[in-house]
């Protein structure tokens, strides 16, 4: 569940988001409609912490993810966002495109854990890279199955239709 409480975003003197309040429950389908320049993309970027709000709260699973002290990467793994303009790497297969971000994030966490463990008694788990890739691949196959593209795992984006590319992204 996501609770948005009095979310505001200014760019200089221009107030783009003016105190948005809403609750999005698990399974809800939400459409954000408005004229060009009305703040739709800014709102979505704030929800996914790609843009810092000027004020307000975004409560995701009980945590205010707009709080700068919160490690957003922990929560971002549970979120998804499909952009109007998507980018797939044409030199990578569909499965490699899907695995790329989770593998890079997990490797970054692994490096942080290694450094942490060098200086602290409370040890963090350090997962082998092979395990990270295996888990990412399993999850990617599940996602492809959910969107009906499991037969496209090993093809390149150039062979997909526009709708298929959108679903992969």
Predicted regions, residues:
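ABC family nucleotide-binding domain
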Residues: 1-169
């Amino acid at each position: 569940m996501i609770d948005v409480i009095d979310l505001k975003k200014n760019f200089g003197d221009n107030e783009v988001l003016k105190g948005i309040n809403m609750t999005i429950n698990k399974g809800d389908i939400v459409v954000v409609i408005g004229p060009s320049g009305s703040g739709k993309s800014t709102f979505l970027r704030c929800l996914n912490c790609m843009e810092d709000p000027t004020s307000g709260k975004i409560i995701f699973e009980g945590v205010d993810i707009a709080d700068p002290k919160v490690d957003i990467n922990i929560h971002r793994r549970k979120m998804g966002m499909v952009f109007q303009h998507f980018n797939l790497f044409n030199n990578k297969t569909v499965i490699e495109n899907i695995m790329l971000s989770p593998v890079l994030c997990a490797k970054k966490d692994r490096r942080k854990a290694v450094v942490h463990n060098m200086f602290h008694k409370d040890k963090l788990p350090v997962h082998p890279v092979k395990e990270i890739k295996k888990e990412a691949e399993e999850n990617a196959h599940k996602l492809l199955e959910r969107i009906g593209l499991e037969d496209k795992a090993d093809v390149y984006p150039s062979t997909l239709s526009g709708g298929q590319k959108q679903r992969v992204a």
